[in-house]
C-alpha cells in the first residue's frame, strides 16, 4: 500500500471555529494522514465542550496514530483561549502554528499544508503587521509573487488583484502584472493540478469588456496586448471576455480556469455555487497550501454548528496537489 501523504493542518484563530473543524477530521476520515498544529490543551478543552470522545495523540513522524485518533503537533498558547473571545496575546501563537507548518513543508516532512481561518485584526492588535495568510506565506518562503485562486462548484477562479479598494483596481492592472499572474497560474495548473496545456478564460475589466473602447480602454491598451504576447509563447488564453457572460456553463466546460481582474468580479459566482465547500489555493509557492474559504465565525465557535465541508475539501485538494507536485 502506498504511504499516505502527511498534511499539516493549522487550527487557526483559537477563539474561532478552526479548532472545532480540525477536531472533526478523524470522523471525516480523509485518505491523507492529517496532523493538527495547535495547542494540545486547547483542542482537548474544545473537544470536551463539543462532547467529542476523541483521542489526541502526540505527533510522531515515524509512528502514525491509531485509527480514529487526531495527531497533534503541540504549539503552546500564550494565554488561555475561550471560544468566541479574541485575545491579542495569542496573535503570535497563530503565526507560530503557521511557521511550524511552513518549515515542515519546506523540509519535506509534510507534503502540504491546510489552514483554518485566522483573524487578521487580532494579529495586528498583537503588534505584528499582518495582511493575510497569502502574503505571510510568500514572505516566509521567499516568494516574490503569489496568486490567489479559489476552487469549488466545478470552477477554478484566480485573481489578478486581490484585496484592493475598487477605485485602485484599474491602475493596478498592468501588462507586467498580467504577465506574472498568468505565468504563475499556467505553471501551477500544469505542475500542481496535472493539467496539460491548460485553457484559461480571462475576464475583461470593464462592462462588456470595454465595448470596443466605449466603456474603458483597459482591454485594448493593456489586457489584450498582454494576452497576445503570452499566446505567442503557446499559453492558451481566451479573452478578454465580458464578465457577465463568462461564467456560463458552456464556456466553463471548455476551460480549466478563469482569471478575474478583481476580487468581487470573480468570487461571488464561485461562492454562490460552492458555499460551504469552497477552497482557497495559493499559487506560486514552492509548497502546496490550501485553505478554507470562510472566516473565524466567532459566534459559532464551541457550538457544534460549524460546517467542516470546506476544510475536508481543502484537505482532499491538498493531497491531490501534493501528489501531482511530487510526480512532476
Curated annotation (Swiss-Prot):
Q: Name one Pfam family in it.
A: PdxA
Q: Hey, which pathway is this one from? A: Cofactor biosynthesis; pyridoxine 5'-phosphate biosynthesis; pyridoxine 5'-phosphate from D-erythrose 4-phosphate: step 4/5
> What is the protein name given in its UniProt record?
4-hydroxythreonine-4-phosphate dehydrogenase
- Summarize where a divalent metal cation binds, as residue positions: 163, 208, 263
Q: Which UniProt keywords apply?
A: Cobalt, Cytoplasm, Magnesium, Metal-binding, NAD, NADP, Oxidoreductase, Pyridoxine biosynthesis, Zinc
Q: How does it assemble?
A: Homodimer.
| Localization of this protein | Cytoplasm
Catalytic activity reads:
4-(phosphooxy)-L-threonine + NAD(+) = 3-amino-2-oxopropyl phosphate + CO2 + NADH
Q: What does this protein do?
A: Catalyzes the NAD(P)-dependent oxidation of 4-(phosphooxy)-L-threonine (HTP) into 2-amino-3-oxo-4-(phosphooxy)butyric acid which spontaneously decarboxylates to form 3-amino-2-oxopropyl phosphate (AHAP).
The cofactor named in the record is:
Zn(2+); Mg(2+); Co(2+)
- Going by the entry's taxonomy, the superkingdom of the source organism is recorded as Bacteria
Under the heading InterPro entries, the entry gives: PdxA, PdxA_fam
Family under the similarity heading: Belongs to the PdxA family.
Positions that bind substrate: 133-134, 271, 280, 289
GO terms under biological process: pyridoxal phosphate biosynthetic process; pyridoxine biosynthetic process
For molecular function, the Gene Ontology terms on record are: 4-hydroxythreonine-4-phosphate dehydrogenase activity; cobalt ion binding; magnesium ion binding; NAD binding; zinc ion binding
* Transmembrane annotation, as ranges: none
Amino acid at each position: 500500500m502506498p504511504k499516505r501523504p502527511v498534511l499539516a493542518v493549522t487550527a487557526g484563530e483559537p477563539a474561532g471555529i478552526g479548532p472545532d473543524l480540525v477536531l472533526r477530521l478523524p470522523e471525516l476520515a480523509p485518505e491523507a494522514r492529517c496532523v493538527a498544529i495547535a495547542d494540545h490543551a486547547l483542542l482537548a478543552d474544545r473537544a470536551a465542550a463539543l462532547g467529542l470522545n476523541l483521542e489526541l495523540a502526540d505527533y510522531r513522524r515515524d509512528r502514525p496514530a491509531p485509527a480514529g485518533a487526531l495527531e497533534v503537533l503541540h504549539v503552546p498558547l500564550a494565554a488561555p483561549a475561550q471560544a468566541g473571545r479574541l485575545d491579542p496575546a495569542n496573535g503570535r501563537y497563530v503565526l507560530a502554528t503557521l511557521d511550524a507548518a511552513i518549515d515542515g513543508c519546506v523540509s519535506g516532512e509534510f507534503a502540504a499544508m491546510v489552514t483554518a481561518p485566522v483573524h487578521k485584526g487580532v494579529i495586528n492588535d498583537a503588534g505584528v503587521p499582518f495582511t493575510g495568510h497569502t502574503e505571510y506565506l510568500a514572505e516566509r518562503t521567499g516568494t516574490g509573487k503569489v496568486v490567489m485562486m479559489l476552487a469549488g462548484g466545478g470552477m477554478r477562479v484566480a485573481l489578478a488583484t486581490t484585496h484592493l479598494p475598487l477605485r485602485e483596481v484599474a491602475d493596478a492592472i498592468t501588462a507586467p502584472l498580467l504577465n506574472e499572474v498568468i505565468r504563475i497560474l499556467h505553471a501551477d495548473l500544469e505542475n500542481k493540478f496535472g493539467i496539460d496545456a491548460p485553457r484559461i478564460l480571462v475576464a475583461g475589466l470593464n462592462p462588456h469588456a470595454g465595448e470596443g473602447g466605449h466603456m474603458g480602454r483597459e482591454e485594448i491598451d493593456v489586457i489584450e496586448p498582454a494576452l497576445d504576447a503570452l499566446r505567442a509563447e503557446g499559453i492558451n488564453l481566451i479573452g478578454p471576455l465580458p464578465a457577465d457572460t463568462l461564467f456560463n456553463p458552456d464556456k466553463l466546460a471548455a476551460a480549466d480556469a478563469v482569471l478575474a481582474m478583481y476580487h468581487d468580479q470573480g468570487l461571488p459566482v464561485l461562492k454562490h455555487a460552492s458555499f460551504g465547500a469552497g477552497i482557497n489555493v495559493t499559487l506560486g509557492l514552492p509548497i502546496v497550501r490550501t485553505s478554507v474559504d470562510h472566516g473565524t465565525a466567532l459566534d459559532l465557535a464551541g457550538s457544534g454548528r460549524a460546517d467542516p465541508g470546506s476544510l475536508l475539501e481543502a484537505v482532499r485538494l491538498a493531497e491531490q496537489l501534493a501528489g501531482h507536485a511530487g510526480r512532476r
